[in-house]
Amino acid sequence: MTVELFKELLFSPFGLALLALLAERWFPWPEQWHPFAVLRLMAAYMSGKVNKPDRPSSQQKIAGFLALLTMLLLVLLPAAIVFAGAEVSLAIGWLILLVSLRQQTVRQATHLSEQHLSKGRKNAARAWLTRVTWRDCDLLSEHGIAKTSIELRATSILESRFAPLLFWCLGGPLAALGVRVLAELKEVWPTAQARYRHFGQATAWLYAITHFLPSFFLSLFARTVGLFRRNTPKIEPLKRNPLFPTILLSWLQSFSYCHKVTLGGPIQAAGIRISRQRFGGRPAELLLSQAARWQRIWQVFFITCLLIGLFTLFIYRP
């Protein structure tokens, strides 16, 4: 292999994505210095200013749409200007992808929560989960803590890994950043909470559109793997829930089917109980110790896909 060919493969979309995956996994980036921390603060501040609960629902929907448009412009427009005007556009694009693949916050919080739960410290376990989810975690039982932790890990596989990688390969760094920003805003403005019931509808709608293909491909692979495992639970028709993203619910169902773990079921947000379809399997608290290993397996799967892409480029190079 010549030096020119090595550089061509290394700086290809698959090579850069592989480097970004490894960098995000092994090099720590403090949460307070990450751009998404600023994004969440800006989104929360903006919603506090323009989302007034005493206004009609139509005005709240319009305010939510304008807030979404503003946040996307504030994030994507400067990134596009820097990316287009930089002499080292590959490096800038790689940094944008690295930002979009941020998973350390959820991974560390769930890991510490699982550690505390294994030692019987339920309050500490609940506190760590509260930092990374809009759900009410104060009254969670051991089963609820375990199920929430696994669901957060599964959600991060879709939103923090596969969706940015897929959009990176299809549309470049700005597409990867855009789809990840939507996932972040969906967490800041969850329609499951009454105050964002109408304000967050535009974000939830665009999230469903952009995450349809990533959820479909991941769910298809997970269900295919589940077919070759013994004693997998039966897949029941998915029941739509207006207060929880159907796209995400479909992925959680497939994840539950693949790993034979109980997920879904009712949750609580801002004091309101929200019913969700339950997906059968073994109790989550019995399989919680394997959750980190499952996440690593999916990481290896993504790395394998990128290596296959690199090998394909090598075989079919001009």
Q: PLM ranges: what are they?
A:
Residues 1-318:
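Hydrophobic N-terminal alpha-helices or hydrophobic patches in metabolic proteins across all domains
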